[in-house]
């Protein structure tokens, strides 16, 4: 990982800064995705006729008390990681395939409804980043900064080096291959979404892809997309919680954190204490 490289090449002080920067980065990613998952989960429950109190589906900053679904999914994924790397990796692979199929279905339905008028004006807020009267930054550069958020996961792959049979080959294929594949998927999904509906409409929804399909008259497909998001979106949490806990683990082993946190469970072969600590930290941010 970037931490290990910094520790080896630049020294302990730089590695300490890089390590905590990665921890902050991963914490923000996991908490954000957990809140996004909560939006799909709550929407799915509402479709089933089940409503949750506003106080339990939003944090204090959004007028609630705690985002209970976001906190629950964080601890659920952490529990899976504590059960063992092999088990979590197998489930992750299955869910990723399911997620790719769902995105393929979305593109197949939304792309035929493509309306070029939705792309006009092509850059409605201009190229440079600018602050709007509502306090929200807009523009191509502001959007680019947000899109980089989607590429954080490629660094997380390198945190699995010690648990990989052939890291020299496998990590290279994993990082480059997934970056190419994900970029193509991102472009296709974004093109299909913006072409099918104005971004000003679905951009405000907590479940944008499902909303687009419903508006196109594909209610059942929207339900499937929502269900798949609920089932498969935790793969992002899985990857980043794994990466974050392993960074904590290595920092602990290197003496930059209490060494007791680097203890590995004899039965599962996983750092249970540091994984639980990571989950508590992320759940506090998400909730």
Q: Where is each model-derived feature located?
A:
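Hydrophobic transmembrane alpha-helices that form the core helical bundles
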Residues: 1-74, 79, 230-250
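Short amphipathic alpha-helical coupling elements at transmembrane boundaries
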Residues: 1-8, 90-96, 159-173, 211-214, ...
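Select transmembrane alpha-helical segments in multipass membrane proteins
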Residues: 11-24, 69-73, 132-147, 214-238, ...
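Loop-to-transmembrane helix boundary motifs in multi-pass membrane proteins
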Residues: 12, 63-71, 165-186, 203, ...
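Membrane-water interface regions at transmembrane-helix termini and the short interhelical loops
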Residues: 17, 21, 72-98, 162-163, ...
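Membrane-helix boundary/coupling elements in multi-pass transport proteins
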Residues: 21-36, 146, 151-165, 186, ...
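Helix-loop-helix junctions that connect adjacent transmembrane segments
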Residues: 49-68, 97-227
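Alpha-helical transmembrane segments of multipass membrane proteins
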Residues: 78-79, 107, 190-191, 230, ...
